[in-house]
Amino acid sequence: MTDSLHNAPIVLDNGSGTIRAGFAGDDVPKCHFPSFVGRPKHLRVLAGALEGEVFIGQKAASELRGLLKIRYPLEHGIVTDWDDMEKIWAYVYDEGLKTLSEEHPVLLTEPPLNPRANRDTAAQILFETFNVPALYTSIQAVLSLYASGRTTGVVLDSGDGVSHAVPVYQGFTVPNSIRRIDVAGRDVTEYLQTLLRKSGYVFHTSAEKEVVRLIKESVTYVAHDPRKEEKEWAAAKMDPAKIAEYVLPDGNKLKIGAERFRAPEILFDPEIIGLEYPGVHQIVVDSINRTDLDLRRDLYSNIVLSGGSTLTKGFGDRLLTEVQKLAVKDMRIKIFAPPERKYSTWIGGSILAGLSTFRKMWVSIDDWHENPDIIHTKFT
């Protein structure tokens, strides 16, 4: 086991919508795929046509999608089905990385303010089932800041399951200032599905919901001024060029109008879908205002975006406008939107796990057997 502690650590970015895995020190993850498990929903009539009862990875996400009932084991950053989570991790090791789990320490990412039980079970499975030699868990947003080359800033990380704002100053997180809302990309997909149904386009199976996710990624945008945009649509003055056309897998064409900006609007106004959460702009300002007065100016001038939902067209511009409305007058606000922000959590993990000092940060399997609570006392 001592030898395995010297091998390159594996960075496992365990996202609610996408899992990314690879070796520390690499520039990009070696494998990434939607973090769902697919099971055949029809009776098998041809022996040997499809081997296995469970399908994971790119094959399940593309060519077999229509045959499968799809389930995500992670909801809002919390694992709701550990059996399926274990299957996904096994697939990562066997097919994605083609390596043995017991030969590499692991850096596992997680959202902030997650239940302790989630980390306990993750550690138990990785140590007991996969026999990993050592484990370290890190908050996703902090890793995104490392990837941007900064040690000070507030990261707004909005992925598929969770959106959170995390202030970091000179490499230290300010725990009492972290803000989290369980509104993110999957909620946008579900709301778009509802809006399309009202327009006469019905997507009801779990596989068709994946099609809606692809539509969302392709055509949605965040309106700079949603009220003005709504008025233009109501008055039918909207430029026909604003109507997007999307070709469905069966060749039919879908015309999408105001749904394009109405769906992602829930990130800024979750009350649209009946959720009593503040918007993403509000959690950024709240998290900064909870820090010491001396830190705020530096944080406002270093707002870093991370996660797939921030890639929505117009997101950064709208965020800047909304933060300016809430911030102190004449405050200098700068938002950084790294082009690789879909992977920035993984990249930050690769940087951190590649440092020689990383060995001092992790918990070895022996330490964990002696005291399982060490994963809470040693990691923030």
Curated annotation (Swiss-Prot):
Q: Which domain of life is it from?
A: Eukaryota
**Does the UniProt entry include the keyword ATP-binding?**
yes
GO: which molecular function terms?
ATP binding
A Pfam family it matches: Actin
Q: Is the keyword Cytoplasm in the record?
A: yes
Q: Which Gene3D superfamilies match?
A: 3.30.420.40, Actin, Chain A, domain 4 (3.90.640.10)
Q: What subcellular compartments does it reside in?
A: Cytoplasm, Cytoskeleton
Output a single Gene Ontology CC term carried by this record.
dynactin complex
- InterPro entries tied to this protein: Actin (IPR004000), Actin/actin-like_CS (IPR020902), ATPase_NBD (IPR043129)
Ordered alphabetically, the record's keywords are: ATP-binding, Cytoplasm, Cytoskeleton, Nucleotide-binding
Q: What does this protein do?
A: Involved in nuclear migration. May function as a component of the dynactin complex which activates force generation by cytoplasmic dynein.
State the similarity comment: Belongs to the actin family. ARP1 subfamily.
Q: Indicate what this protein is called per its UniProt record.
A: Actin-like protein
